């Protein structure tokens, strides 16, 4: 089946009328194997797979890389065709925001921590565009990656608190053989930085091993790990051990945990996380 490219909301709604099993995979394009894994998960679960490609200006801060974000539509469409997607929704900014978007979704306070602390307003922009996409596509299933763990948590809350009839499917983080999490931003790394970038995942694995061997002094583990990366030239935004169910800082009563990190190699901000149990 040939991939359909649809840029207009009205045309997409007309095409989807009568479909009784729709999966949505929202992306900003510049697709890699991590995105394609999400499309394949969607393909297994739904009769009609819609991938959106939209570089959402609401989720970029004043000093972030909106204008420089790679736009690779032809290559993306070839990958989506091969992965079995049915439709790619490619709206313009004018199509998604014909007037100033004065109505916004305000996420819970957790959105101001972790990645939200360094990127104020980011998750407002994410939640708002995802709600718009949910309303436009009206999917039965939506697929998001676990690499953006905080985003996944906020979207699950969006669905729960607004009673949206959508099943959220979480795709496992896809990695290079070195352990580096696949990311569109990896393309910004030079060879030396890419070699060093492997260390982020290795550091998280060491934290998991440390905790599972009985060390429960989470603040000390976080501080030591941040100091270790800083001494190696990283600029660390955060390393944080949290409850994977509430995303609040982990207490000794929590058994399902996630360690999350964001740190920069040069100008490139990398994020990663590992879920684990104790």
From Swiss-Prot:
Gene that encodes it: panC
Subunit and partners: Homodimer.
Protein name: Pantothenate synthetase
Organism (species): Methylobacillus flagellatus (strain ATCC 51484 / DSM 6875 / VKM B-1610 / KT)
EC class (word): ligase
GO BP term, example: pantothenate biosynthetic process
Domain of life: Bacteria
Similarity comment: Belongs to the pantothenate synthetase family.
GO cellular component: cytosol
Gene Ontology MF terms in the entry: ATP binding; pantoate-beta-alanine ligase activity
Compartment list: Cytoplasm
Active site: 35 (proton donor)
Catalytic activity as recorded in UniProt: (R)-pantoate + beta-alanine + ATP = (R)-pantothenate + AMP + diphosphate + H(+)
